[in-house]
């Protein structure tokens, strides 16, 4: 059984980050790691980063035409490492085209690096902030150059205090080396990089809510994602990228897109950081090539399922928003955007939550529902009414005495098409979870339901 909260296994993964060991890279070309210091865990002073080749050739990269940078990112097939996996190059190009208008020339774009990391089961971004700060800074500089931005905000989860302090020290070091500020490395280009602590709300991980939080407003999603490109922060054209996405940019630009696409498979390139927690022997963060088999990820790089693979009952492959896969699906699927989409699941943030008891399925869903009921903005019917209404039904399923009428009501509430009547993707998160148990665990639902 999972314990109170999200479960003690997850709490161990969240709170024991100092002792988390990031495993060796799986299946990469020549064993290359995008983020080697996640294993080495050296203190990243800027002189050490420079000695390791970070910021190398940056003065030349700053001279690139922005479209050249965007083309390299497009060729790499890099997709967002946050929740939605949107092609990064296309996002950059959309903003670049938008700012080529008369209005765009008068107003400089803004870049936002999203390190809010409020998803249940995700702790990869915290390790990036702690151990690869200069890769984040360098990636932010490259992203800003690609869209000709002069300001970048690093939005960090509020309770990542130590990581925020460390990042600020590294930013100060970068300013001292003329890597930030006016006239970067003797060029005419300038970039100001500012840290902004998150509002402490789960909803600020959503793009438009994040922008409202940065503006000092109450974070409520209300802007379609495509509109933030033309009118985002303070009405300026805005590029929002996840911190892991940004951290991939230096290697892509320096080593070339062919290097990046040598890992993974078409439309699912490069490596990915996976936060693995729950019923595994070694909860940790793993850097693996895209398309690694899920079973291989768990068995060979997370110490295996507690009690052995035969004890496995299900896995949330991308956090709660991805829904839960049954054992048979877990044995077949590979960890990438397209393979999981084919199962009506998603990669999400790469938060892999492993369960080895059927009771845990319904206990985890109940815990997630309680979390959403207090942490979403309650604007849309799904989050405002739907989530709270299903809590009693999920309690019944967990305890084995759900009523058939309750189940029919629950499934009807979440039977709307995806993204129907919702402002943001969070409204679909609970919907995916409900659909996944209905689709992948029908026998368990029948077993736990009273007919009368």
From Swiss-Prot:
Residues involved in FMN binding: 198-245
Protein localization: Mitochondrion
Molecular function per GO: 4 iron, 4 sulfur cluster binding; metal ion binding; oxidoreductase activity
Disulfide topology: none
Main location class: mitochondrion
A GO biological-process term: cytochrome complex assembly
Cofactor note: Binds 1 FMN.
Cellular component terms per the entry's GO annotation: mitochondrion
InterPro entries, alphabetized: ComplexI_51kDa_subunit (IPR050837), Nuo51_FMN-bd (IPR011538), Nuo51_FMN-bd_sf (IPR037225), Nuop51_4Fe4S-bd (IPR019575), Nuop51_4Fe4S-bd_sf (IPR037207), SLBB_dom (IPR054765)
Extent of the transit peptide: 1-25
Cofactor(s) the protein needs: FMN; [4Fe-4S] cluster
Keyword 4Fe-4S: yes
Keywords assigned: 4Fe-4S, Flavoprotein, FMN, Iron, Iron-sulfur, Metal-binding, Mitochondrion, Oxidoreductase, Transit peptide
A Pfam match: Complex1_51K
Binding of NAD(+), residues: 80-89
Gene3D superfamilies cross-referenced by the UniProt entry: 3.10.20.600, NADH-ubiquinone oxidoreductase 51kDa subunit (3.40.50.11540), NADH-ubiquinone oxidoreductase 51kDa subunit, iron-sulphur binding domain (1.20.1440.230)
EC number per UniProt: 1.6.-.-
PANTHER family in UniProt: NADH DEHYDROGENASE [UBIQUINONE] FLAVOPROTEIN 1, MITOCHONDRIAL, NADH-UBIQUINONE OXIDOREDUCTASE FLAVOPROTEIN 1 NDUFV1
Family affiliation: Belongs to the complex I 51 kDa subunit family.
Protein name: NADH-ubiquinone oxidoreductase 51 kDa subunit homolog SPBC18E5.10, mitochondrial
Natural source organism: Schizosaccharomyces pombe (strain 972 / ATCC 24843) (Fission yeast)
